[in-house]
Amino acid sequence: MKTNILTIIILSCVFSYGSQLAYADENLKDLKRSLRFAYNITPCDYENVEIAFVTTNSIHINTKQKRSECILYVDSIVSLGITDQFIKGDKVDVFGLPYNFSPPYVDNIYGGIVKHSNQGNKSLQFVGILNQDGKETYLPSEVVRIKKKQFTLQEFDLKIRKFLMEKYNIYDSESRYTSGSLFLATKDSKHYEVDLFNKDDKLLSRDSFFKRYKDNKIFNSEEISHFDIYLKTY
């Protein structure tokens, strides 16, 4: 009798553990599908455009282009205090991921705004290292190309994710990757981390994923030392 009870307990534990693994696997697949959909997007990318007006937490920009016979605007939502750095009439560069396309003549983004600087056609390149389960590989210098003296973490993040999606299929439902991080290192030994799997986000939507860019984190290209990407399969 005791043997039968023990067997039942063991089988129950095994079944419960297996169910938890299956549930976690499905959750990861859902997360990957949502990330693939969210980041498979064409960014708002404009140079030398003008700020129409600013509010407490938004920057409204006239792109001088037309969509649906109307002037196309970009409305950037930012954290409190960010708009103090900009005024009406400022010339800016925009690189942001739209989370809302309604109305059709306004693209809504979070952050993604830097003061315009005339960098010409010179592309900046960065040293990068990919670490997969402890195995390091130096990445080609053209993985991330940026033409601005200043850029946002949002732009760098998207270009890294695009590279990883195209080269390593990190967000494919059946891919072996379970987690990953991007570390952007500056010459004063500071590191800025981005969770490439957005595991802190409760809602699997563009709006939720892209809110992380509200702080409009800006880097000067001359400050960058290198970047590291860590991917894990366990």
From Swiss-Prot:
Keyword Signal: yes
Annotated signal peptide: 1-24
PROSITE patterns: STAPH_STREP_TOXIN_2 (PS00278)
Domain of life: Bacteria
Molecular-function annotations in GO: toxin activity
Keyword Signal: yes
A Pfam family the protein falls into: Stap_Strp_toxin
Keywords: Signal, Toxin, Virulence
GO cellular component, one term: extracellular region
Misc: Binds to major histocompatibility complex class II beta chain.
Function: Mitogenic for human peripheral blood lymphocytes.
Similarity remark: Belongs to the staphylococcal/streptococcal toxin family.
Entry protein name: Exotoxin type G
